[in-house]
Amino acid sequence: LQVSLHASKIDISEELRNNLYEKNSNVILTSATIKVEESFGYFLQRNGLTENDNIITRDYVSPFSYQDQVKYFQYGGSKDITSDINELSDLIYHVHKTFNKRTMVLFTSVRMLENVSKKIKERLGGKKIPLFAQSRGASKPSIIKGMHSNENALLFGTNSFWEGVDLPGELLEVLIVVKLPFDVPSDPLIKSYSCLLYTSP
């Protein structure tokens, strides 16, 4: 029997100040989600900074026009489609068939990804539509390279594909989100963060 204990600090503001800000003359922090209710205050507080520090904040409007460049569709069925692998697979298949564009499907479960991938492969049969499914044997760079090379490719991803994937323009035109990735509420770290948020002024 082997037992291991793991610890993680909830508040790392002091570490950031001592090891990052005070050891560097210039630090640039960027994100699309830094502001809360049009204020940088919460981000500054959580990251060891105050209004008294020599800070310059800037807010830039995104040049991306959602109204002109995005069409949003939501499944309107009466049940949770993720509970029916066959129906979910049919929906993904028909969406890809309708648009016939490079499509990425994001999952929160590896098992669901594998099950749907198997069903889609059966539906595709001999069609020349490449399907790249994230698995233990496929690397992220090789999957992205495959998307570059095939105009109507299907990409099934989870975990690392939820962020840090750059497929601009025609390299990715259809995105299907099977289920939003919420953290497990019972996770000790998540519970600690939640308590901290509720007790913060």
Feature-to-residue mapping (PLM):
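ASCE RecA-like P-loop NTPase motor cores
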Residues: L1-S200
